[in-house]
Amino acid sequence: LERTMTERSVKRGEYLYQGDRDCTGVFWLRYGQARVFLISGTEKQITLYRLLERDSCFLSASCVIKNINFDVFIQAEKDCRILLLPANVYQDLMEKSFPLATYCNQILASRFSDVMWVMEQTIFTSLDRRLALFLLEQKAIDESSDLHITHEAISNHLGTAREVVTRM
C-alpha cells in the first residue's frame, strides 16, 4: 500500500479533481483546506462540503464507485499536501477488504448527509440566513473575526450570484 501511494502539494486555487476529466483516486488531506462543489451548465457553483486537515475524499475516485452520476470538482482553498491512493488500487482494496469497504461506506454516508444538509438549506432557508450561517462557519474555520473573502467566493459557496451577495 505504501509503495502505491504518492504525496503531492497543491497550491491555493488549484484543482485536486475536475469531475470526469480525471480519475485521480482517493486522497487524504495531510494539511490545508479544499472545497468540494458542483458547477452548473451556466457556470454557477455551490459548495457541497469542505475538506479540512486529515479528511479523506472518495469522490475523487468516482470512476470506480458504482452509480455516481454527477461530476464534482475539488479546489484547494489553502495550500494543501495530499496523500493519493490510485483509483485502481482503491478498487482492488475495496473488493478484498470488507472492513475497509465498511469504513469507506460510512464516510460516503456522512458526506451524503452533508450534501443533503446543503440541499435542505438551499431549498428551505432564506438567503440572508444562509449567508449568516456561512459567515459564522467561515469565522470558525479561519479562527478569526476578520474574514478575507470576496463576494464572488461567498456566492460560489452559496450557489447564488455575486450581485445578490453584494446587495445583502
Sequence positions of predicted segments:
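Regulatory nucleotide-sensing modules
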Residues: 1-31
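Short beta-strand segments in beta-sandwich/barrel cores
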Residues: 6, 15, 33-38, 56, ...
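Phosphate-/nucleic-acid-contacting segments
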Residues: 127, 136-168
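Short, Lys/Arg-enriched, Trp-marked, Pro/Gly-tolerant hinge/linker segments that flank
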Residues: 115-127, 143-144
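Cyclic-nucleotide recognition modules
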Residues: 47-106
